[in-house]
């Protein structure tokens, strides 16, 4: 199991957004040996949220050889302009882009762009096919109920051929795992929505679905994203972070988040990660909620060695 780092695109109230802050974070992740950086996406949220594709483009020159990715709202962004923007990021990163697509769980993101939230799953399936069609240069194109690429020749196309890998988010439902197997190049699981035993059960189902769609389960990658993190030996600080920051942000009870996220001592955090490693998680994207540069260092110095001695 290896590790990536979420970009600090949420304002938790401790520091202002700046290019210098993002750059320092990414350079630190690069120098510490993180394998990838990832920007998650919302148009509006309970806290201010920096635009994900813009943030990702801004840090390319600091990212070295790390993979760069975004878990992006494929429908809300619009599949054609999104495909255009992501193709540019792949070119400017010299082919290091991977794309995470998810419909999102916030109805407000849909309301503000006048898209029916109840249509999201049908639109989502089509949006993925639209992006693949545009990136591959498919002469036939794609025509669905909501979208069509007929007559569109989107240029320039991504550097990576036939396209950057498309990973699909699923919390582990049967329908979601079928979608991952049918349309995806990898599976994005959510840390705060997926306990290790749930991940193990979902991974078993996913492998069955991959066989149905003629894909090799052994070579199909997975990753655990949104692993919010604050490493501290201070028990009172642990409780403050859980109760005052993460519960409000994620709308989950404290006890659930205490079980699932990396909040607490290095030993506690390492034990949680070891459990995910044991059930087949291949990569975990950590998301420090404050003191982010120092938290990256603490993670590498005090947590990772306990997981991978």
List where the protein language model places each region.
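Hydrophobic faces of well-ordered beta-strands that scaffold small-molecule active sites
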Residues: 3-7, 37-39, 67-71, 97-101, ...
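N-terminal small/glycine-rich loop or linker at the start of catalytic domains
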Residues: 1-14, 106-108, 147-164, 235-260
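Short, acidic/polar
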Residues: 16-29, 82-85, 170-179, 264-275
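N-terminal beta1-alpha1-beta2 module of alpha/beta enzyme domains
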Residues: 1-62, 162-164
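Alpha-helix-loop-beta-strand connector modules within alpha/beta enzyme cores
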Residues: 50-70, 127-130, 300-309
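Internal, glycine-rich beta/alpha segment that forms the wall or movable "lid"
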Residues: 78-183, 204-206, 213, 218
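Active-site mouth loops of central-metabolism enzymes
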Residues: 6-20, 72-80, 162-172, 255-267
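C-terminal helical cap(s) of enzyme catalytic domains, especially alpha/beta-barrels
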Residues: 128-132, 197-207, 292-309
